[in-house]
């Protein structure tokens, strides 16, 4: 089978109605656009959210909150993902080497999700209470 020989099954596709080709077609003269107005013209569109000059909903509602810039350089790592780290010391560079966090990450936190079987030493990372208990139960330790 060649891609350039593929075609739809016979009768499965209908040709679209051609606009502006006589009154008898049902789509002659104005071609389904109605009479006059911005939307009848070529290129006649209004931008998304435009409400005809009325104050748009987006501007009627109050602003709220903000996005912390620290969230762009912070990441969470699941406990089960620590198995992908080679070696027994887990720090930020080890997480980057194992492709668990991207290169722009500066802060990481280990959270309790899944299980850990090997003993690891966690250095310079924040750890949740549950994850800390699980790491220590597996024979590992946490260093600041």
UniProtKB/Swiss-Prot annotation:
Keyword set includes Transmembrane helix: no
Example of a GO biological process term: translation
Top-level taxon of the source organism: Bacteria
GO molecular function: rRNA binding; structural constituent of ribosome
Keyword rRNA-binding: yes
Keywords: Ribonucleoprotein, Ribosomal protein, RNA-binding, rRNA-binding
Annotated InterPro entries: Ribosomal_uL15, Ribosomal_uL15/eL18, Ribosomal_uL15/eL18_sf, Ribosomal_uL15_bac-type, Ribosomal_uL15_CS
PROSITE patterns: RIBOSOMAL_L15 (PS00475)
GO CC, alphabetical: cytosolic large ribosomal subunit
Biased composition (Basic residues): 32-44
Database matches in SUPFAM superfamilies: Ribosomal proteins L15p and L18e (SSF52080)
Biased composition (Gly residues): 21-31
Function: Binds to the 23S rRNA.
Family classification: Belongs to the universal ribosomal protein uL15 family.
Subunit structure: Part of the 50S ribosomal subunit.
Protein name from the UniProt record: Large ribosomal subunit protein uL15
Gene source species: Vibrio cholerae serotype O1 (strain ATCC 39541 / Classical Ogawa 395 / O395)
Encoding gene per record: rplO
